[in-house]
Design a protein with these regions (language model features):
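Short, surface-exposed amphipathic charged segments that create phosphate/polyanion-binding patches used
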Residues: 197-202, 254-268
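Short phosphate-binding/catalytic loops that engage adenosine nucleotides
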Residues: 180, 240, 244
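TOPRIM metal-binding catalytic domain and adjacent DNA-binding surface shared by DnaG-type primases
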Residues: 1-22, 27, 31-34, 42-130, ...
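Short, acidic/turn-prone active-site loops that include or flank metal/cofactor-
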Residues: 186-192, 212-214, 249
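Short, aromatic/basic amphipathic alpha-helical patches
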Residues: 219-240
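Acidic beta-strand-to-loop metal/phosphate-binding motif
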Residues: 165, 205-226, 246
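Phosphate-handling DNA/RNA-contact segment within nucleic-acid enzymes
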Residues: 112-206, 221
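Acidic carboxylate-rich catalytic motifs and surrounding loops in phosphoryl-/glycosyl-chemistry enzymes
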Residues: 245-252
Length: 278
């Protein structure tokens, strides 16, 4: 499996030269550029580019037991944080986010005193913890080192004929506040494999992808693209279910909820979207 790292200002995308959205393989052999097209579309959005003069992929792979032990440690770490969790923290966080307290609790958040941030577990399609997303009071987001991507959802959810897919834990809490069966991806281009597994396990027949209302980004040729919608389309194309894409009138679902959106408002907007297979 190829290991990817995000581009930065110090190490921008080698294709479009931008400091965000794109990724480069750890061995320097490949680049997924979200702006410059190639003949190979990436399943998570963007296009795959083979970099010139790149070194061959390494043959060595770490022992698989190491990964399993690490995930077990993350699950134990989250469980230990949950033992200290108190309804006062929950009430304050729910109030600051503008979501329902019970809906937020279904995601099993915790407070991490070492990082001075709230901790949201990321799970695979079977419910096991695969990583921990951190969010401080200023809204800054990062993850506990050593974990991987996963989904934000209620581990008690056993079945759902229709699933709403959001971006991030707070939008997922907003969807749960509206009374939806929901799961959140870490970003608009990740969590695909876990979501496929979750959809199969829950018996989902339909999936509504709720895309962030992002501003337009520019490709090198000057054409515009919208990360949230592009990521939603890429996801819809690989789920193998009836899907539709909904874009809230505010920057994301939680912002729309804060502005007073109701379940009826959501259903009216969703009804205007077209169901498609793939």
């Amino acid at each position: 499996m190829i290991e990817w790292k995000r581009v930065t200002r110090q190490e921008p995308c080698p294709v479009c030269k931008k400091p965000d959205w794109c990724g480069v393989s750890a061995d320097g052999a490949w680049c997924v550029c979200m702006r410059a097209e190639s003949g190979h579309a990436s399943k998570n959005g963007g296009w795959l580019h083979r970099l010139k003069d790149a070194p061959p992929p390494p043959k060595f792979r770490p022992p698989p037991t190491r990964r399993r032990n690490l995930l077990a440690s993350l699950a134990s770490y989250h469980a230990a944080l949950r033992l200290r969790w108190d309804w006062i923290w929950l009430d304050g966080l729910a109030l600051s986010l503008g979501v329902d307290m019970d809906a937020l609790e279904r995601l099993q958040p915790a407070y991490d005193p070492a990082n001075k941030a709230f901790a949201f577990p990321m799970r695979d399609g079977g419910g096991a913890v695969t990583g921990i997303r951190l969010r401080d009071c200023g809204g800054h987001k990062w993850a506990v080192r050593g974990g991987g991507d996963g989904l934000f959802y209620d581990p008690a959810m056993a079945a759902a004929g229709e699933l709403a897919v959001c971006e991030g834990p707070t939008d997922t809490a907003a969807a749960l506040t509206l009374g939806l069966h929901a799961a959140g991806r870490p970003s608009c281009s990740s969590g695909v494999d876990a979501l496929r597994a979750l959809v199969r396990r829950l018996g989902c027949r339909k999936v509504t992808v709720i895309a962030d209302h992002d501003g337009a980004k520019r490709r090198p040729d000057g054409s515009a693209w919208f990360p949230g919608v592009q990521g939603a389309r890429s996801l819809a194309s690989v789920l193998g279910r009836m899907t539709r894409i909904v874009v809230p009138p505010e920057k994301d679902l939680r912002a729309w909820l804060i502005e007073g959106a109701t379940r009826q408002d959501y259903e009216a907007l969703a009804a205007s979207a077209t169901w498609r297979l793939g």
